[in-house]
């Protein structure tokens, strides 16, 4: 039975569990839920809400999108082995009152204290608008006072959606402002707190996430069959949640992700696009507390026995994955003589460098004290190692010309600031010349 929304106000505590469900015929009478969600609701995770003997039963308070609260039974099938968990008595009435249909998606979240909030997505994969949400104003730019009611859509990641993913036509029509339809770049805020720039493609079939989308999925361990839920924050900025094949929310914080996040927090220097001088006695990167050191990608040498193969020394890279994304490299003898510079795979993958391409390096040159400036650019070939690490290399075709034109010497430090995957601004910190 529905009740007053204020009745749920006493529930406190952070969200404990989330689950996504697709409504099947059996879901309208009794909706199955995950063991994790059931354990929270039934007090089996140490919150003191567990029952006594027999199969545990407990009523959850389900808050509908229109602000009403429904009492719904939570229980397990009594089959002698714990049984499957479900939302039972009261759920059928909730489903009927909200007009839920076959193939709809339901996202439930436990807010604590037995209170469940519900989001409903119809067969267009867009958040269902009941038109009666209290105290919420939502605009085409996606701004809303209540974050849960901002425009949202979800997609099941079928194999064809890994390379590029179509944004639902209904979502584009209702929630993408007209002035944004000709913008070719969106931003996604990952669960790790980093913004990723994703290229937008538009054709007669609609609007798609494309350039950088596959790299975003790969970096976060998002796989075919997962479901992505994107919430529009406005101005083509999206927040994302991911659910696994079992419907449970995925934790995307891998070991590598945490390392990168910690590295980014320790970077206090924002690179500029000017050429500066540095003390020749100072060591590269000593102004940065967290230096990342990588082994350069292997350079194929002669296989003839007894012939020495010349290999680069280990070089230090300090980088941040953004935006803005940037990486610093100290110029070595090897880079100048062999015309090859190696960049770490994690950095390359994060900006979308996953295949052979050409990168434009650009330097801005200011003219004296005036505000006028000019820019020069060089095209440099880039290869990507297919050895699993994804290291990329700026090749002699273009890199040597760049070094010669800018008079680079051993000890100089180049900061490459990524504007787009294949367009980088370069700032040069020159070692003092004797």
From Swiss-Prot:
Keywords: DNA-binding, Nucleus, Repeat, Transcription, Transcription regulation. GO terms for molecular function: DNA binding. Residues 27-124, 150-246, 326-432 bind DNA. It is found in: Nucleus. Coiled coil: none annotated. InterPro entries: B3_DNA-bd, DNA-bd_pseudobarrel_sf, REM_fam. It comes from the Eukaryota. GO terms for cellular component: nucleus. Pfam families: B3. This is Putative B3 domain-containing protein Os04g0347400. The lineage of its organism: Eukaryota, Viridiplantae, Streptophyta, Embryophyta, Tracheophyta.
